[in-house]
A protein has these predicted regions:
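RNase H-like nuclease fold core
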Residues: 1-62, 66, 70, 75-78, ...
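Short, well-ordered secondary-structure micro-motifs
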Residues: 6, 72, 96, 152-153
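Amphipathic alpha-helical transducer elements in NTP-driven molecular machines
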Residues: 11-14, 39-43, 62-69, 86, ...
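A generic hydrophobic-helix recognition signal that picks specific residues
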Residues: 56, 80, 160-163
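Conserved beta-strand -> loop -> alpha-helix junction used to position metal-binding or nucleic-acid-contacting
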Residues: 59-66, 71-109
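Acidic/histidine-rich catalytic cores and adjacent linkers
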Residues: 113-187
Length: 187
């Protein structure tokens, strides 16, 4: 909770942008509070970090927040945008019947753990052949988002492990929650 313009406590989300440099050093680039997110919000956040010295972003891993990928491409056009695989999996499994989840996940794992993008596409075709009739919305989501879900295949295994998920920022959020969970309101 934060205090609003009328000094009342309101619930707001805090959006964090964390960068990792070539040496693996992590840095909090910005914390932003907003009532809602969207392209204009993300444009202002990215313009802010650019004005404070960020010259380029090689790879951005996002959880597919509304307007974020477009804003990244607008401010930093050379950036490779990778949608978090873990978020995509969580969103997918919600639509799969519980009795099929274990088998479906085993088949899906063949897609995102493939050795190459080409192999992943073959595995995605296999997934669709096996599960497409039962779960067309899941397959459609993977197909529609494939460019951003498969961007990490162009990098080595070491880089892939860092960028296929938003675990870096999620870990930071866990640390913040530990410190702030007993705090009532931020002013």
């Amino acid at each position: 909770k934060v205090m609003d313009e009328k000094n009342r406590p309101v619930t707001r989300a805090i959006y964090n942008i964390i960068g990792i440099n070539r040496d693996g050093y992590k840095d909090l680039l910005g914390m932003y509070i907003s009532k809602s997110e969207g392209a204009n919000f993300w444009l202002s956040c990215l313009s802010d970090i650019q004005s404070r010295g960020v010259k380029d972003i090689l790879i951005a891993c996002t959880d597919n927040l509304t307007g974020f990928s477009d804003a990244i491409k607008s401010i930093f056009p050379q950036t490779t945008v990778q949608t978090c695989i873990v978020h995509q999996i969580r969103n997918s499994i919600k639509y799969v019947a519980s009795k099929n989840q274990k088998t479906f996940m085993k088949d899906l794992k063949q897609v995102y753990q493939a050795v190459s993008k080409e192999q992943a596409e073959v595995e995605l075709d296999n997934l669709e052949l096996k599960w497409g009739e039962d779960y067309p919305i899941v397959i459609k989501s993977w197909r529609d988002n494939w460019d951003k879900l498969s961007a990490y295949f162009q990098y080595s295994d070491g880089i892939r492990k860092m960028i296929y998920t938003t675990n870096t920022v999620e870990g930071y959020h866990r640390q913040i929650r530990k410190v702030t969970k007993n705090k009532g309101v931020f002013t």
